[in-house]
Swiss-Prot record:
This is Chaperone protein HtpG. Homodimer. Belongs to the heat shock protein 90 family. HAMAP family: HSP90. GO terms for biological process: DNA damage response; protein folding; response to heat. The keyword Signal does not apply. Residues 563-637 are annotated as: C. It comes from Shewanella oneidensis (strain ATCC 700550 / JCM 31522 / CIP 106686 / LMG 19005 / NCIMB 14063 / MR-1). InterPro entries: HATPase_C_sf, Heat_shock_protein_90_CS, HSP90_C, Hsp90_fam, Hsp90_N, Ribosomal_Su5_D2-typ_SF.
Length: 637
């Protein structure tokens, strides 16, 4: 036995331990689920490593978890014969949180126990959940393939530090002993532990065993002798891979508990799909849509993907090759009969079997979402609130499924008068006016800016619906989604409005006449504004506002410019087209001005007003204020 060393917990571990004890007190029994789940993972890892090194089994290939309790001592012990840990592994895994985005996780905590418990659950507490019920935790572990005298003893009271020393342990694997708090001694009861195992761990694919006491010899009802039986370790769970069982035999509760096992989420899944595929490729998949987005969904370093099994043997976590990035929220597993047991991430990358499975699984998930949207609109809105912005990445990433993804998108609309994104493109098409051939939309900084944009005035007057987009990703989305079901998506802030048959002959004639009559005014404004605009035109889209700016058909939009600037990207100079409304009193009075200097000032003021309305900011706000003050002063004389 080596000299004992004391190590301090990583700061984040101290925070997590404190938060757990104070936030998860209402669901204490999850400690057993977490520790059994970890033990099962250790067995999976050993099985995988033993594929290339059978000696790691050390003559004991029957993998299992054993749980025992000592009422007198007030202890619970969870023991496995899985892969075990080395000394360095113990210090790394039981003293730190090696997760990217950990600091961000702690920032998101609110201090409200119910909310924080959900967030902590998403983060995944694993081993540290032991301290919810234990005043001290003792871990004895030996890594597979290491000598008996290279085992490690780890111990901590969950305060600020832990001790580590080298010990001798005859068998490989990990043994965790919880020294229960005085008010948690209920967990040192065999029947209590059995009920928790049945509730949370029935789906674990290796036996979770508890000691079954033997019985002495006794007399039977007819005076015959019933022989004594010896005690033995009895499996408390079904110990078969849940995904290999018949769907009709699996309860919703079992599916939900399995979801929590593989995802380490504390909340139920929103929906799931369990399928066996036969044909050119043979595989089983069990896919879950979570009910809540993980706290680190937008973290670029976050690992995602399905658990991969080959012929029931665990191969790897986070096999991202089977799921496109825009579906990275999907949890679950895939079990293939066709891939080799020695498959690596590199082999998966360019494998035709992988690509075929990815295509099939992607279609399966999209089908799940389509069915949910059709059968339960309220539940689909719950999904959209959590994952809608991620799904919007789809049209750019997955050309083959672009139309299906587009059908799943939801937007706010002038039809509903609400900021809630509840309108699908199919809803929009079903309400299109007779003769309407385009789907009209606007992208702005906020819902209010979109809903109140002057670009909508004529369309509102005609009762034509406009989709209102205000998320950062919407401009990116719309650049890759130009049509849906042969209907072109058309921005009301770009190029010509193009109402087509929605504009009758009389309106067209009136518009042409107005443009002709206003030609001298337009030329004067062009001269006044010079190089600050690409063009000046009579508007066809305004009814109540004097002027607006419009992006040219081939030019970069205002929102895309903002996105690129925010990302520190160089942005080309884009000059707007300035549209004026000659019917507005301000513009008609402007036309009457004979003083060309005053005319130029008023023209510039109208332009900057329009730019402020469109962009929400100006390149030189102080110049705008100076000009406005100058104009106010001149008119207050």
């Amino acid at each position: 036995m080596s000299q004992q060393e004391t190590h301090g917990f990583q700061t984040e571990v101290k925070q997590l331990l404190h938060l757990m004890i104070h936030s998860l007190y209402s669901n204490k029994e999850i400690f057993l689920r977490e520790l059994v789940s970890n033990a099962a993972d250790a067995a999976d890892k050993l099985r995988y490593l033993a594929l290339t090194n059978d000696a790691l089994y050390e003559g004991d290939g029957e993998l299992r978890v054993r749980i025992s309790a000592d009422k007198e001592k007030g202890t619970v012990t969870i023991e496995d014969n899985g892969v075990g840990m080395t000394r360095d592994g113990v210090i790394e895994h039981l003293g730190t949180i090696a997760k990217s985005g950990t600091a961000e996780f702690f920032k998101n905590l609110s201090g409200e126990a119910s909310k924080d418990s959900q967030l902590i659950g998403q983060f995944g507490v694993g081993f540290y959940s032991a301290f919810i019920v234990a005043k001290k935790v003792t871990v004895r572990t030996r890594a597979a393939g290491h000598k008996a005298n290279e085992a490690v003893l780890w111990e901590s009271e969950g305060e600020g530090s832990f001790t580590v020393e080298t010990i001798t342990k005859a068998t490989r694997g990990t043994e965790i002993t919880l020294h229960l708090r005085d008010d948690e001694k209920e967990f040192a009861d065999d029947w209590r532990l059995r009920s928790i195992i049945t509730k949370y761990s029935d789906h674990i694919s290796i036996p979770v065993e508890m000691w079954q006491e033997g019985t002495p010899e006794r007399d039977g009802p007819d005076g015959e002798k019933i022989p004594a039986t010896e005690g033995y370790w009895k499996a408390m769970n079904k110990a078969t891979a849940l995904w290999m069982r018949n769907k009709s035999e699996i309860t919703d509760e079992e599916y939900q508990e399995f979801y929590k096992h593989i995802s380490h989420d504390y909340t139920d899944a929103l929906l799931w799909s369990h399928n066996r595929v036969e044909g050119k490729q043979e595989y089983t998949n069990l896919l879950y849509i979570p009910s809540k987005a993980p706290w680190d969904l937008w973290n670029r370093d976050r690992k995602h993907g399905l658990k991969l099994f080959v012929q029931r043997v665990f191969i790897m976590d986070d096999a991202e090759q089977f799921m496109p990035s825009y579906l990275r929220f999907v949890q679950g597993l895939i079990d293939s009969n066709d891939l080799p047991l020695n498959v690596s991430r590199e082999i998966l990358q360019d494998n035709h079997i992988t690509k075929a499975m990815r295509t099939g699984i992607t279609k399966r998930v999209l089908g799940m979402l389509e069915k949910l949207a059709k059968d339960d609109a309220e539940k689909y809105q719950q999904f959209w609130a959590e994952f809608g912005q991620v799904l919007k990445e789809g049209p750019a990433e997955d050309f083959a499924n672009r139309e299906r993804i587009a059908g799943l998108l939801r937007f706010a609309s002038t039809h509903t008068g609400s900021a809630a994104p509840t309108v699908s493109l199919d809803d929009y098409i079903s309400r299109m006016k007779e003769g309407q051939t385009k789907i009209y939309y606007i992208v702005a900084d906020s819902h209010e800016a979109a809903a109140n944009s002057p670009h909508l005035e004529l369309l509102r007057k005609k009762g034509i619906e406009v989709l209102l987009m205000s998320e950062r990703i919407d401009e990116w989305l719309i650049n890759h989604l130009t049509e849906y079901k042969e209907k072109q998506l058309h921005s009301v802030t770009r190029g010509e409005l193009e109402l087509g048959e929605l504009e009758d002959a009389a309106e067209k004639e009136a518009q042409e006449k107005l443009a002709e009559e206003s030609a001298p005014l337009i030329e004067r404004i062009k001269a006044a504004l010079g190089a600050s605009v690409a063009d000046v035109k009579v508007t066809s889209r305004l009814t109540d506002t004097p002027a607006c700016v419009v992006t040219g058909e081939g030019e970069m939009s205002t929102q895309m410019i903002k996105l690129m600037q925010a990302a520190g990207q160089p942005v080309p100079e884009v000059k707007p087209t300035f549209e004026v409304n000659p019917a507005h009193p301000l513009v008609s009075r402007l036309n009457d001005l004979q003083d060309e200097a005053a005319f130029a000032d008023w023209s510039n003021l109208l332009l900057q007003q329009a730019q402020l309305s469109e962009k929400g900011s100006l390149a030189d706000p102080s110049a705008f204020i100076k000009l406005m003050n100058q104009m106010l002063l001149a008119n207050l004389k």
